């Protein structure tokens, strides 16, 4: 199947229904903030290895977290008080931590310098956000993502201490409910997020 190349001077994307069986919609283009917002509004996101061209994805099925489906297990609920939490105070550091955290079955990271630079611009525009977990003032976990309408698009998380990222996620879910959000777009299915209550749609 032919995968279309994006025009650098045109922000439009193919329809997500035109993605190939792997979920790839297009390749090329750039990480212009306006293009990124247009992509996420269409259910499309960039995900590519360091030396590859930009690849744009819209997986089907994809993983979402309905806010009422989040499973706050007793052990995690007990550990929530171990941490203090902040929003949007160390966005770039959160991204860098997510980029350098070793992950099972993953060689390297897709969170490269260009991604960090582009999403930091979105953070400055009030579109990308971080939630951070601290112990005694030290950053020990957190996550980041994008706020698109009433959907939070979760990107990545890290934990230097057990449950630090899960706790940040639990606090995020609580606030998203208060703010009237509908769900978290988790994008690619993972067993970890499924264990917290996410489902494929």
Feature map (PLM): residue ranges:
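N-acyltransferase acceptor-side catalytic subdomain
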Residues: 1-201
């Amino acid at each position: 199947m032919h995968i279309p190349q994006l025009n650098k001077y045109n922000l439009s994307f193919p329809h997500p229904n035109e993605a190939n069986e792997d979920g790839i919609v297009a390749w090329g283009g750039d990480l212009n903030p306006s293009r990124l917002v247009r992509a996420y509004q269409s259910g499309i996101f960039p995900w590519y290895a360091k030396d590859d061209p930009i690849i744009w994805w819209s997986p089907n099925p994809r993983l979402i977290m309905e806010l009422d489906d989040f499973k706050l297990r007793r052990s995690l609920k007990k550990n929530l008080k171990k941490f203090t939490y902040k929003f949007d105070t160390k966005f770039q550091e959160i991204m860098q931590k997510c980029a350098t955290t070793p992950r099972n079955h993953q060689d390297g990271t897709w969170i490269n310098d260009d991604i960090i630079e582009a999403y930091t611009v979105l953070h400055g525009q009030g579109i990308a956000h971080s939630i951070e977990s601290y112990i005694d003032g030290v950053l020990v976990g957190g996550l980041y993502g994008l706020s698109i309408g009433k959907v939070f698009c979760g990107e990545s998380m890290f934990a230097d201490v057990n449950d630090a990222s899960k706790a940040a996620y639990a606090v995020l879910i609580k606030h998203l409910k208060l703010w009237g959000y509908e769900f978290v777009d988790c994008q690619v299915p993972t067993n970890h997020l499924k264990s917290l209550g996410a489902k494929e749609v």
